[in-house]
Amino acid sequence: DWLTIDICDEGDDDRLFRLIADADVLWHVLQPATAEVIAAAPKLRLIQKIGVGVNTINLEAARARNITVCNMPGTNSQAVAEATVMLMLSALRRGMAFHDATRRGDGWCMDPSVFDQIGEILGRTVGLIGYGEVARRTAPVVAALGARVLYTATAPKDDAVGEWRDLKSLLVESDVISLH
């Protein structure tokens, strides 16, 4: 009886405001923890973001009430890095065009206008804009596949996989650009 966990679906504002009135902790996923939500929670002591960013939490309202805000940095970096590489490969290999053709029953078209545009990451230059945790995990994977890696960040990183460039140079030199 010392712990009660209530679940509220995203977008169910009526239930949210009913529950938040007696909540000590808000486990926050996507629905914004606005100043209005925080004001409706007189007992609230902690907002725990189940994820990385806190951009959906009104930090000023939480700070004004001395409510602690926590997040989970790095928890999805590997998954996002893997998805980044998958999307690069899919774009280069024209994955969606072949997927759509297969779903229509057309099979794999050997039409040169489609087939000749298929590329590999080998020999390409991949530019990473930003060099946080996701880019740090993406860089060695694309390098292992044979890509040249460039990155831009506020300053060159000693432990980076790849070569630092200013943004303009990175955009000019890169075949594939990934925002991080």
Question: Where are each of the predicted segments found?
Answer:
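Short loop/edge segments at beta-strand edges and connector loops
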Residues: 7-9, 73, 153, 166
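An N-terminal-biased, well-structured beta-alpha scaffold segment characteristic
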Residues: 1-69, 172, 179
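Phosphate-binding beta-alpha-beta segment of Rossmann-like dinucleotide-binding domains, i.e.
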Residues: 65-67, 73-125
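Short, charged, surface-exposed secondary-structure boundary motifs
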Residues: 56-60, 79-83, 159-162
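Positions that flank functional sites
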Residues: 13, 35, 77-78, 157
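Short, acidic/turn-prone active-site loops that include or flank metal/cofactor-
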Residues: 51-54, 74-77, 155, 170
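Short gly/ser/thr-rich secondary-structure transition/capping motifs
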Residues: 5-11, 27-29, 104-113, 158-164
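Rossmann-like dinucleotide/phosphate-binding beta-alpha-beta segment
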Residues: 112-180
